Amino acid sequence: MKKIFKYAMVGLLGCVTLSSCLESALETSPTDSMSGTGLLANANAALVPLNGIYRSMYASWSPSANTHQSFGISSYTLMADLMGEDMIQAAQGSGWFWFDCLYNVKSRYTSTAWRSYDVWNCYYTWISNANYILAAESTMEGEKADVNYVIGQAYAIRAYSYFMLAQTFARTYKGHESEPCCPIYTEPTVAGTQGNPRSTVQEVYDQLNSDIDKAIELLNGTERKH
């Protein structure tokens, strides 16, 4: 009887072990990467995509042949100076940067090799990434201060991006409130998402002011990590 019981227990343990192995083998979640849902499940994991946004701010957005003119966020702020009144191009010269910064060469609007495409692609990529983080606000787990930090940073990034797009692709705010500005996206998008029409200058500034107010509220009292 003891031998029978012993063999029965060994067999039972073998079945349990085999069952566990089979469940492990059938696990579909990768062990060397995380899904977008997994990255946004808690505040600590969400620092990864947030860090990615900040890392991309000093990376080139252009093909290798044009990294001299689009080498990250600094190149866009330098370009903004050139398009303003602090620095004046008095003559076209050889043509370098003349039409590029005026944005009036239509053949270059859709080219990935020129600045207008870079600026548009850059800021809307940050907006898209921020929208994914913000969409997880109600489900993100973690200490309240940590969640507030991640969400607050995402609001700040989106506000800044819309501000720069408005500065670049629209006229000044005062006196032009009802004129076209840039499209507004506040929800995650994917390839094939129907594009939104251009919002007015007033609508874009209302959106970015709302975002920055939320960022200030959430980031108040949190430990700075960036």
Regions found by a protein language model. Give the residues of each.
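A structural signal for short, hydrophobic/glycine-enriched beta-strand patches
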Residues: T31, A43-N44, H68-S111, W120, ...
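Sec-dependent bacterial lipoprotein signal peptides
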Residues: M1-S19
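Surface-exposed patches in mature extracellular/periplasmic domains of secreted proteins
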Residues: S60-Q69, D146-V147, T222-H226
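Conserved, well-structured interaction surfaces
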Residues: S94-F169, S199, K214-K225
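Membrane-proximal, proline-rich intrinsically disordered regions
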Residues: C21-T77
